[in-house]
Structure formats: C-alpha cells, structure tokens
Curated annotation (Swiss-Prot):
GO terms for cellular component: ribonucleoprotein complex; ribosome. GO terms for molecular function: rRNA binding; structural constituent of ribosome; tRNA binding. The gene is rplE. This is one of the proteins that bind and probably mediate the attachment of the 5S RNA into the large ribosomal subunit, where it forms part of the central protuberance. In the 70S ribosome it contacts protein S13 of the 30S subunit (bridge B1b), connecting the 2 subunits; this bridge is implicated in subunit movement. Contacts the P site tRNA; the 5S rRNA and some of its associated proteins might help stabilize positioning of ribosome-bound tRNAs. PANTHER family: 60S RIBOSOMAL PROTEIN L11-RELATED. Part of the 50S ribosomal subunit; part of the 5S rRNA/L5/L18/L25 subcomplex. Contacts the 5S rRNA and the P site tRNA. Forms a bridge to the 30S subunit in the 70S ribosome. Belongs to the universal ribosomal protein uL5 family. Keywords: Ribonucleoprotein, Ribosomal protein, RNA-binding, rRNA-binding, tRNA-binding. Pfam families: Ribosomal_L5, Ribosomal_L5_C. It comes from the Bacteria. One of its GO terms (biological process) is translation. SUPFAM superfamilies: RL5-like. This is Large ribosomal subunit protein uL5.
Length: 190
C-alpha cells in the first residue's frame, strides 16, 4: 500500500501578515484588551455595471468572463428591477454582475490587487482616503480591467470599469483606515 498525503493549501500571505503583524500593531494603536476587538476584513465585493447591455445582451457575457478571470469565482448577474423607457431598459434585463469574495479567495484577491494591479495603473498617485461610508467600509473604482494580469489586453472587446467595496468588521472609519493602511492600501497623502 502506498501512503498518500494530502497537503493543505497554503495560507494566503496577506492573511499571514494580518495575523502575525497587523493584529498586534492595531492592538497597540487602539489599546484593545482583546484580540477579537481588532478590525478585520469581512468580505470584498467586486461589481461591474454594464449599462450598454440594455442594447446588446452579449456585452454581459464579456463582463462575466472578465470577473471570473479576475476573481476566480463565477459572478452573480444583476437584473433591472424596473423598466425605464429613456434607457431602453426592460424589467428583468441583465445590466451588471458582481462577486462577493470571502475567506482565502478574498485575501488572495486583495494581495493581487495591492501588489500587481494597482501599480500597473498609469500615473498612479494613490487611492483616495476619503471614500469611507461612515460605517467602516471602503469603496473605490477602477476604470479598466486590463490592469489585472489574468486579463489578456489583446482579447478585450470593451473597456469595463469596476467598483470594489471592502467591508470591515469595525463601524469606525478611523479604525478601518488604519487597518487598510497596514494591509498596504496606497492612500494619497493629503
């Protein structure tokens, strides 16, 4: 008989950094008595609105394909709730897609975003540090999908932007800012 051992998948390096370095730093900074009080990233939502899909239904397929390549997870398609004649939109028509990332996939996506994608943006000076929603969540947008290595620039049919929401466990923007700064988010210095 042969012994077969199954190796556990490697822990994402950003998660290791969070557990080993960031938690102790935030405990000192905010004087927490319990490590469970430290802010943590709960989920990341990546969404792509495809308004032009109202006229051409094939555009949504490209958005789904791009989001699948970028996040490693199949997106959920969002549909119009109401018909709007001015936008040539019918109720139930596909108009966008989104992915909710949790766990290791979330950590891997954040790592790729911070180390590979954001530095590839032309004339990048940092992201705005004032886009918190008052509840400890951070929202920002990217203008094109080609900055991710998973997307082949030659195969892009349309340039699509995306919105990224980082949901944290804290309800305070100051704590969320400190968490994201420690994780490596390149905020602009104002």
């Amino acid at each position: 008989m042969t012994d077969t051992t199954v190796e556990a998948p490697a822990t994402p390096r950003l998660k290791v950094k969070y557990n080993e370095q960031i938690i102790p730093e935030l405990e000192k900074e905010f004087k927490y008595s319990n490590p469970m009080q430290v802010a943590r990233v709960q989920k990341v939502v990546v969404s792509m609105g495809v308004g032009a899909a109202a006229r051409d239904s094939k555009l949504i397929e490209g958005a789904v394909k791009d989001l699948t390549l970028i996040t490693g997870q199949k997106p959920k398609i969002t549909k119009a709730k109401k018909s709007v004649a001015q936008f040539h939109l019918r109720e139930g028509q596909a108009i966008g897609a989104y992915v909710t990332l949790r766990g290791d996939r979330m950590w891997e996506f954040l790592d790729r975003l911070l180390t590979l994608a954001l530095p590839r943006i032309r004339d990048f000076r940092g992201i705005n540090g004032h886009q918190f929603d008052g509840q400890g969540n951070y929202n920002f947008g990217l203008t094109e999908q080609s900055m991710f290595h998973e997307i082949d620039p030659d195969s892009i049919d349309h340039v699509r932007g995306m919105d990224i929401t980082v949901v944290t466990s804290t309800k305070d923007d100051k704590e969320a800012y400190a968490l994201l700064k420690h994780l490596g988010f390149p905020f602009k210095e104002n």
